[in-house]
Amino acid sequence: MNRIGILSRSDGSSEWKQGSARVICGVNGPIDVKIRDERLNKATVEVLVQPVSGVAETLEKMISSRIVGILEDAIFLNTYPRTLIQVSIQIIEEDGTDTLAAVINGAVLALLDAGISLKYIPCAINCHWKNKITQDEPDVDGTINKLESIITICYSISSEPAKLIFLETAGPIPEEDFFRVLETAPLHAEEVSKKMKELLFETYNESDGHENEKNPKEDVEMDVVA
């Protein structure tokens, strides 16, 4: 289940499930920043990603670097000069295919819960493309070989039409199918944005003591198979 405001020691927090991935995100800030990291006219954004078990390694550091760039562009950094906005992300479940999109959306929800001002809402989706010609050919060890391309796409959602801000692919995909994915992806990203807004509205309505008149919250399915 997708939730916000779940961590009592964070200014904002979220639990977000997307496909095979589930993450818990916490935001603290704006808080004091170390002098060496201080930026005179804007905030510093720090993202820490922890794996399901063990310590952060290359993959988690790679995810962190990607998330920092996305969040720095979305946040009104000049509103919080000489401060730190710290985003901590714990991966609870994953199989490596949906993690990046889940982390992006979970972090954005936690920022919104913390009241951080955003220029727009970044919304990420995953597209899984399978090579239909070879997907049933067994590997040498007898397992089924399913060649798959995983495409993570992030759009900025605001009053303007959705704008592509991030795209990453893992694995080959024919050009025709790739552009077909790009044609439909903005609609799915806008659906993610709608689900986020509904979750925020429902949660704060409940916290104010108002009866929730909407349907029960459901996990958001954002995988688009092209």
Curated annotation (Swiss-Prot):
Residues 205-226 are annotated as: Disordered. GO terms for biological process: exonucleolytic trimming to generate mature 3'-end of 5.8S rRNA from tricistronic rRNA transcript (SSU-rRNA, 5.8S rRNA, LSU-rRNA); nonfunctional rRNA decay; nuclear mRNA surveillance; nuclear polyadenylation-dependent mRNA catabolic process; nuclear polyadenylation-dependent rRNA catabolic process; nuclear-transcribed mRNA catabolic process, 3'-5' exonucleolytic nonsense-mediated decay; nuclear-transcribed mRNA catabolic process, non-stop decay; poly(A)-dependent snoRNA 3'-end processing. InterPro entries: ExoRNase_PH_dom1 (IPR001247), PNPase/RNase_PH_dom_sf (IPR027408), Ribosomal_Su5_D2-typ_SF (IPR020568), RNase_PH (IPR050080). Residues 207-219 have a biased composition (Basic and acidic residues). One of its GO terms (molecular function) is 3'-5'-RNA exonuclease activity. Pfam families: RNase_PH. It comes from the Eukaryota. Its main location: cytoplasm. It is found in: Cytoplasm; Nucleus, Nucleolus. The keyword Iron does not apply. Keywords: Cytoplasm, Exosome, Nucleus, RNA-binding, rRNA processing. GO terms for cellular component: cytoplasmic exosome (RNase complex); cytosol; exosome (RNase complex); nuclear exosome (RNase complex); nucleolus; nucleus. Component of the RNA exosome complex. Specifically part of the catalytically inactive RNA exosome core complex (Exo-9) which may associate with the catalytic subunits rrp6 and dis3 in cytoplasmic- and nuclear-specific RNA exosome complex forms. Exo-9 is formed by a hexameric base ring of RNase PH domain-containing subunits and a cap ring consisting of csl4, rrp4 and rrp40. Belongs to the RNase PH family. Non-catalytic component of the RNA exosome complex which has 3'->5' exoribonuclease activity and participates in a multitude of cellular RNA processing and degradation events. In the nucleus, the RNA exosome complex is involved in proper maturation of stable RNA species such as rRNA, snRNA and snoRNA, in the elimination of RNA processing by-products and non-coding 'pervasive' transcripts, such as antisense RNA species and cryptic unstable transcripts (CUTs), and of mRNAs with processing defects, thereby limiting or excluding their export to the cytoplasm. This is Exosome complex component rrp46. It comes from Schizosaccharomyces pombe (strain 972 / ATCC 24843) (Fission yeast). The gene is rrp46.
